[in-house]
A protein has these predicted regions:
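Helix-coil boundary/capping segments in enzymes
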Residues: 1-275
Length: 275
């Protein structure tokens, strides 16, 4: 069985409310999520189950509490509807509004109890804030209580204006922001506070496993109890690329096959030299 853990979709109402989300960095236009289209793609490439998520990095950008909640509900309702109609083909990651923690926790409870969703997708930062900060503790408490996985996906970073030329934000900054966000989660002791936390790092975790020895350094006084490496090795890493085969082998040699998940990054994904 092939399960694609990195399968993005854009409901029509979501695109209407965030017009800038209608095109990716290449200028390729997205259209409203269509179940049949996605199922046809899955049949074409032999994918048995697609785990639906949204890139979702723009939701908190304006700091608008009501709009953030509305956008998340649109995403979550759409994905839950797809799962209800095709329960053996679609699974779902919820997106939570991080402007207000009461809204965040309430929406998570709704997604798990009413919508029967299967985990949570969060961007690497929300409007420039990283989710290891103390203000997001209610999110972590609710996530841990639900016992389902957290999928971390790159988003535009606070320093992006320095990287826009030549689209370097897409090529380098996004993997860098994944490395930053996940490292901060580890160093902040999140895995110590929530020992049963299951985390999926998209795009093979950015540069984490390339720089594992450096990430073990104790400068800056990380509060995690164990060597940072021991936490990074508990994380699951998806293959959304393009990724060179040598990098996948490095990940395999470092964490083993059980920690590697298939991800295609549809509809964004593009092949590379080894794809």
């Amino acid at each position: 069985m092939i399960i694609d853990t990195h399968f993005h979709a854009f409901p029509g109402k979501f695109l209407e409310l965030i017009p800038e989300a209608q095109n990716d960095v290449r200028g390729v236009g997205f259209h409203a999520f269509d179940h049949r289209e996605y199922l046809n793609v899955m049949e074409q490439y032999g994918i048995d189950i697609g785990v639906l998520s949204n890139t979702g990095g723009r939701i908190e950008k304006a700091g608008d509490r009501a709009k953030a909640l509305e956008l998340c509900k649109i995403l979550n309702d759409s994905f839950a509807d797809a799962h209800a109609k095709y329960p053996h083909r679609f699974k779902t990651f919820a997106r939570l509004p991080m402007v207000d923690m009461d809204d965040c926790v309430a929406e998570l409870e709704r997604c798990y109890k009413d919508l029967k969703m299967h985990g949570v997708m969060m961007p690497t930062n929300v409007a420039g804030k990283y989710i290891d900060e103390p203000q997001f503790k209610p999110f972590w408490d609710a996530l841990a209580a639900g016992g389902k996985p957290l999928f971390i996906h790159p988003a535009n970073a606070p320093c992006q204006s320095n990287w826009d030329k030549y689209s370097l934000h897409q090529k380098i900054l996004w993997p860098t922001d994944s490395t930053l966000a996940i490292s901060r989660i580890v160093y902040a002791g999140i895995f110590d506070h929530y020992p049963n936390l299951k985390m999926i790092a998209s795009h093979l975790g950015g540069m984490i496993l390339l720089y594992l020895d450096r990430l073990n350094w104790r400068e800056g006084k990380p509060v995690c109890r164990e060597e940072p490496e021991s936490y990074f090795e508990k994380i699951y890493y998806d293959t959304a690329g393009p990724i060179r085969a040598a990098f996948i082998k490095l990940v395999y040699d470092t964490v083993g096959a059980d920690q590697i998940l298939f991800g295609a990054d549809y509809p964004h994904g593009r092949g590379g030299k080894d794809d």
